[in-house]
């Protein structure tokens, strides 16, 4: 057993960046994953094109910072993974706010998942540029259930922004 102690954050948005590590040691960025959690457990993903997801995150974090984080993940993990790991992986992140709710900050690495994540599944199911946004939800009632529903333009409808 073990004990993990983490600080409490005023979370505003959960999201991640999805990647693929090749046999040659190259890291390929696959896209953003904007997801929801319930009781600290994954519950669903926004299915939308990359531009829409970037617009959502850019409400809180500058695009330049997101690109810098993406480039740093690729460069740092390329050497770390070379000849050690091949496959999909995701880096979970979150936007947090200060106690007075005046400033947003990026937590760039909440968790590193060395596997195909639900974010990768969401990227595979994401619509084309002109299709409406959807929400992929997973519920558990004696067994897992997957539902995909249309969502409106109001982000509060998606339960993603707190």
Each PLM stretch: what is its role?
Residues 1-10, 29, 41-103, 143-161:
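A long amphipathic alpha-helix within ATP-dependent nucleotide-binding catalytic cores
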Residues 5-8, 12-13, 20-23:
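Rossmann-like dinucleotide-binding core of oxidoreductases
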Residues 14, 26-27, 104-105:
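Short, mixed charged/polar active-site loops
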Residues 16-19, 92-94:
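Short beta-strand scaffold segments in enzyme catalytic cores
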Residues 19-75, 113-140:
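ATP-dependent carboxylate/phosphate-activation module, predominantly the ATP-grasp catalytic core
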Residues 87, 103-106, 115, 119:
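Alpha-helix initiation and capping sites
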């Amino acid at each position: 057993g073990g004990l993990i102690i983490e600080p409490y954050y005023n979370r505003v948005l959960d999201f991640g960046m999805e990647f693929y590590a090749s046999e040659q040691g190259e890291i390929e960025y696959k896209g953003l994953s904007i997801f929801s959690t319930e009781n600290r457990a994954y519950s669903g993903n926004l299915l939308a094109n990359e531009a829409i997801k970037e617009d959502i995150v850019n409400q809180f974090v500058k695009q330049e910072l997101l690109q810098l984080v993406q480039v740093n993940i690729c460069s740092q993990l390329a050497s770390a993974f070379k000849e050690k790991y091949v496959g999909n992986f995701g880096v979970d992140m979150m936007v947090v706010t200060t106690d007075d709710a005046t400033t947003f900050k990026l937590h760039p690495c909440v968790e590193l998942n060395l596997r195909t994540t639900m974010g990768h599944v969401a990227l595979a199911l994401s619509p084309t540029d002109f299709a409406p946004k959807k929400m992929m939800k997973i519920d558990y009632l004696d067994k897992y259930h997957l539902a995909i529903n249309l969502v409106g333009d109001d982000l509060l409808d998606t339960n993603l922004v707190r």
